[in-house]
C-alpha cells in the first residue's frame, strides 16, 4: 500500500493519521500522532467464525511500552509484564464505543491492538488509541458501522477544554472521556469534582461537536484508502425454526413473565426451555445447531416481550414502576476488628464494604508511562461466584472487576479529606455478596458507609444509581429506568451509572448497546438519576448521617507536622541511625516526605508524643531558656575530681551541667545527685561562641 498522511486540527492541536507504510498484513492499520505522542493501532479478523460461540469475540488491548517514555522496565526480565490497571481501563474505553457497531451474528474473532510508541506528557495517548481504533476498523475490510470519534473534555475556570494538557488536567473539575458517532453519543466515562447535571450535560454536548469533526475526518480517510467490506457469514436463526418456536411458546412465555419474583421466573424459564426442546425433539434434525437456534429464538421472544411491557405498559420484570427503586436496607460496624464496615442492600443486590486506614508509607506506588505517582485512596471490587449462585473457583480480578473498582474509586475521591487534613492511606474493599444488577453502584454506597463508620471525615456522602433504557426502534418510544436489575441490564439498550452527592455528580459511566442516544434522552436520564440518588442517600443517612467522631481503636493513630527540609538529614542520621533509634525507643512508625512533612503512627498516643518531642528537639535551634528532657551519658572529672555531667538532650545534641548547677545547695560529688543513665530535665543557660551548651538541672525524672 502507498503511504498516506492525513491531517486535521482537534482541540487546537494538529492530529496526523498515517496509513499504508506499516503492518501490511493487518486488516486495518494506522499511526496516530499529536505532538510527540504516537500510537499505532492494528485491527485484524479471523477468516472464519469461531465454533461454538454465542457472543461476539472482540478482543481489545492497549499496550504501554516503556520505551515510549525512555524507560527500561523494572524487574529481573527487564520487559513489560502484565498490563497495568490504567492500560486495562483504557482497553475498556476503546472497546465500549466500537462493540455495538459490529453486525449481530458476527462470530469471527476480531482483535484491536493499540500500542503506545511515544508519549508527550501534555498529550494523553489514550484518546489517540480510541481514535486510531476507529480509523483502523473503518479503513479495514472488517464489517463495522462506524466511524466513531473520541475526545477528552476538561472543565477549567468555567470553560470546557478539548483534550486538556497536563496543567489543565491538574486544574480541571472534570475528566470526561467521550465517544460517539456523528449522530449520537456511544460512551461516557467521567470523574468530576461535584458538578451539576447541567454542567455535565453541557460538557457532553460540547465534546460531541468536536466528535462530529473527527468522524467527518475519518470518513474522508475511509473514502480514500478504505477497503471494501468483506462478506462474512453471520449466524442467523432459520426462519422456520423461529416461526415454529414463537407460535408454540408465545402464550407460555407470557405466563413465565407474569412471575415478578426472579427465582420463580427463572425456574419457569428453565421449565419452558425443556418443554420447547422436548416439543421439537423430532423436528429440524437436519439443522446442525438446532438446540442453540431454539434457545436463541426463545431468548429473543423473551427480550421482545420484556421490552414491550416496559415501553408500552410501564411494567418492569419485577413489577416496579419505571422510576421506582428496590427496597434498601443498610448496616454499619458489623466487623469488630475492621476499622470501618458496612453492608448496603438494594433488592437482591448486596455489597459488604470495608475501610482500612494505614500509614502514608502504605500508599500504592504506580509506575507507567506517566511520571511515577502515589495513590493514597484505593478501592477494590470483588464478585465471587456465590453472589450469583454459581459454583465457580476464585480467580484474580478481571477487567470487569478492575473497571468497577475504578468507577467506585473515582466516585468517592472528590469527597475525601486532603492528606494534610487526614494523613492516612485509605483502602476500601467491596465484596459483592449477592448480585442482581447495579453492583458497582452498591459498592459506592457501601464504601461511603464504611468510610463514615471508620471516622474518615468525608466532605459529603456519595450514592450511586444505575439507569437503563429501552428504545423501541419502530415506534420511537423510550423508557428510562431507575435502578436497573440484571435482566433489564441484559435485555436493555443502556447501562448508565451516575454517582454523586446531594450537590452534584462525582462520576458517570455509560455503556450503550444501540447506535447512540441523543440530548433529550441524556437530559431525562440525568434528572431521573438525580432523583434516585437523593432517595438512596436519604436511606443511607438513616443508618449513619455523619462520619464518626473517633477512629476505631484498632486503627493506627497518626500525627503529621512540618519541619525544615534542610534538617531531614539530622532526623535520619548517618545510615538511618538516628531515626532507627527513635523507632526502637518509642515503638512508633515514622515516615518522612521530601517537603519536610513528618508522619508518626502508633496505636499508643504516649509513644507518638514521645517520638514527636524527640524529633522536634532534633530540628529546633537550641536557645537560652529552652527546657529539654535528656539522659546523663558521662560524669565529667579531672585530677581535682568530678566537676560536671554530660547530658544528651536530643540526638546529636549534648550539653554539660556544671557541678554548681546541679543544686542550690553545695554538692561535693556529681554522683551524689546524678549518675550515668539517669533521665533528667534540664534548662539551657548559656551557649558560647563555639556552640557549646551549658545546662542547669531542673529535676531528676528517673534514676538509672
Question: Can you name each region flagged by the protein language model?
Answer:
Residues 104-110, 145-147, 214-232, 263-264, ...:
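Flexible, glycine/charged-enriched surface loops at secondary-structure junctions
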Residues 141-260, 451-549:
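Mobile "lid/hinge" segments at catalytic clefts and subdomain interfaces of large enzymes
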Residues 228, 232-239, 535-561, 609-629:
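Long, charged amphipathic helices and adjacent flexible linkers at domain junctions
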Residues 556, 565-704:
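Single-stranded RNA-binding regions, centering on S1/OB-family and related RNA-binding modules
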Residues 14, 26-111, 116-123, 189, ...:
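Glycine-rich, flexible beta-strand/loop modules in the N-terminal catalytic cores of phosphate-handling
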Residues 28-30, 123-141, 332-355, 436-456, ...:
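Conserved phosphate/anionic-ligand binding catalytic regions in large, soluble enzymes, centered on
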Residues 1-46, 233-370, 556-570, 578, ...:
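Extended amphipathic alpha-helical scaffolds
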Residues 1-233:
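Long, basic N-terminal domains or extensions that often function
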Amino acid at each position: 500500500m502507498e503511504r498516506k498522511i492525513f491531517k486535521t486540527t482537534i482541540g487546537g492541536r494538529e492530529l496526523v493519521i498515517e496509513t499504508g507504510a506499516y503492518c501490511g498484513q493487518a486488516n486495518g492499520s494506522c499511526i496516530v500522532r499529536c505532538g510527540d505522542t504516537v500510537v499505532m493501532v492494528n485491527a485484524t479478523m479471523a477468516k472464519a467464525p469461531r465454533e461454538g460461540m454465542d457472543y461476539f469475540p472482540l478482543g481489545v488491548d492497549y499496550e504501554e511500552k516503556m520505551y515510549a517514555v525512555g524507560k527500561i522496565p523494572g524487574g529481573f526480565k527487564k520487559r513489560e509484564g502484565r498490563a497495568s490497571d490504567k492500560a486495562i481501563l483504557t482497553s475498556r474505553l476503546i472497546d465500549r464505543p466500537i462493540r455495538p457497531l459490529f453486525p449481530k451474528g458476527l462470530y469471527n474473532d476480531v482483535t484491536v491492538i493499540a500500542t503506545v510508541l511515544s508519549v508527550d506528557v501534555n498529550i494523553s495517548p489514550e484518546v489517540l488509541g480510541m481514535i486510531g481504533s476507529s480509523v483502523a476498523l473503518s479503513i479495514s475490510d472488517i464489517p463495522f458501522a462506524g466511524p466513531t470519534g473520541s475526545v477528552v473534555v476538561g472543565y477549567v475556570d468555567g470553560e470546557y477544554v478539548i483534550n486538556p494538557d497536563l496543567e489543565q488536567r491538574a486544574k480541571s473539575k472534570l475528566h470526561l472521556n467521550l465517544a460517539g458517532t456523528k449522530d449520537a453519543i456511544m460512551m461516557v466515562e467521567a470523574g468530576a469534582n461535584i458538578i451539576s447535571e447541567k454542567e455535565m450535560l453541557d460538557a457532553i454536548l460540547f465534546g460531541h461537536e468536536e466528535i462530529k469533526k473527527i468522524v467527518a475526518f475519518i470518513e474522508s480517510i475511509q473514502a480514500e484508502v478504505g477497503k471494501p467490506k468483506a462478506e462474512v457469514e453471520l449466524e442467523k436463526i432459520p426462519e422456520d425454526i423461529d416461526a415454529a418456536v414463537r407460535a408454540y411458546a408465545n402464550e407460555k412465555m407470557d405466563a413465565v413473565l407474569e412471575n415478578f419474583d426472579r427465582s420463580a421466573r427463572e425456574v419457569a424459564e428453565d421449565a419452558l426451555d425443556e418443554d420447547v426442546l422436548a416439543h421439537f425433539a423430532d423436528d429440524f434434525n437436519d439443522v446442525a445447531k438446532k438446540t442453540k437456534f431454539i434457545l436463541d429464538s426463545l431468548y429473543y421472544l423473551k427480550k421482545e416481550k420484556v421490552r414491550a411491557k416496559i415501553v408500552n405498559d410501564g411494567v418492569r420484570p419485577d413489577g416496579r414502576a419505571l422510576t421506582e427503586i428496590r427496597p434498601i436496607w443498610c448496616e454499619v460496624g458489623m466487623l469488630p476488628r475492621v476499622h470501618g464496615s458496612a453492608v448496603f442492600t438494594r433488592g437482591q443486590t448486596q455489597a459488604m464494604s470495608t475501610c482500612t486506614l494505614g500509614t502514608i508509607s502504605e500508599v500504592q506506588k504506580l509506575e507507567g508511562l506517566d511520571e511515577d505517582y502515589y495513590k493514597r485512596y484505593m478501592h477494590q471490587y470483588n464478585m465471587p461466584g456465590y453472589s450469583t449462585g454459581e459454583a465457580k473457583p476464585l480467580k484474580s480480578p478481571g477487567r470487569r472487576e478492575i473497571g468497577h473498582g475504578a468507577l467506585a474509586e473515582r466516585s468517592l475521591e472528590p469527597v475525601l479529606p486532603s492528606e494534610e487534613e487526614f494523613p492516612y492511606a485509605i483502602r476500601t474493599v467491596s465484596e459483592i455478596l449477592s448480585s442482581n444488577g447495579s453492583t458497582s453502584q452498591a459498592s459506592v454506597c457501601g464504601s461511603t458507609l464504611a468510610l463514615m463508620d471508620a471516622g474518615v471525615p468525608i466532605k459529603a456522602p456519595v450514592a450511586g444509581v444505575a439507569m437503563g433504557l429501552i428504545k423501541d426502534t419502530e415506534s420511537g418510544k423510550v423508557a428510562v429506568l431507575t435502578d436497573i436489575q440484571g435482566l433489564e441490564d441484559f435485555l436493555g439498550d443502556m447501562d448508565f451509572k451516575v454517582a454523586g452527592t446531594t450537590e452534584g455528580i462525582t462520576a458517570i459511566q455509560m455503556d450503550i448497546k444501540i447506535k447512540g442516544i441523543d440530548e433529550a434522552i441524556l437530559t431525562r436520564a440525568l434528572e431521573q438519576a438525580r432523583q434516585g440518588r437523593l432517595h438512596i442517600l436519604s436511606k443511607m443517612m438513616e443508618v449513619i448521617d455523619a462520619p464518626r467522631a473517633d477512629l476505631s481503636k484498632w486503627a493506627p493513630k497518626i500525627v503529621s507536622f512540618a519541619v525544615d527540609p534542610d534538617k531531614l538529614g539530622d532526623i535520619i542520621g548517618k545510615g538511618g541511625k538516628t531515626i532507627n533509634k527513635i523507632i526502637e525507643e518509642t515503638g512508633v512508625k515514622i515516615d518522612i516526605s521530601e517537603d519536610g512533612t513528618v508522619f508518626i503512627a502508633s496505636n499508643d498516643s504516649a509513644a507518638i508524643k514521645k517520638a514527636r518531642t524527640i524529633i522536634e528537639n532534633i530540628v529546633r535551634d537550641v536557645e537560652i531558656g529552652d527546657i529539654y528532657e535528656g539522659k546523663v551519658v558521662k560524669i565529667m572529672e579531672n585530677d581535682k575530681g568530678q566537676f560536671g555531667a554530660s547530658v544528651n538532650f536530643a540526638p546529636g545534641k549534648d550539653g554539660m551541667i556544671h557541678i554548681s548547677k546541679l543544686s542550690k545547695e553545695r554538692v561535693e560529688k556529681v554522683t551524689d545527685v546524678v549518675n550515668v543513665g539517669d533521665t533528667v530535665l534540664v534548662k539551657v543557660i548559656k551557649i558560647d561562641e563555639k556552640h557549646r551548651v551549658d545546662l542547669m538541672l531542673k529535676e531528676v525524672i528517673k534514676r538509672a
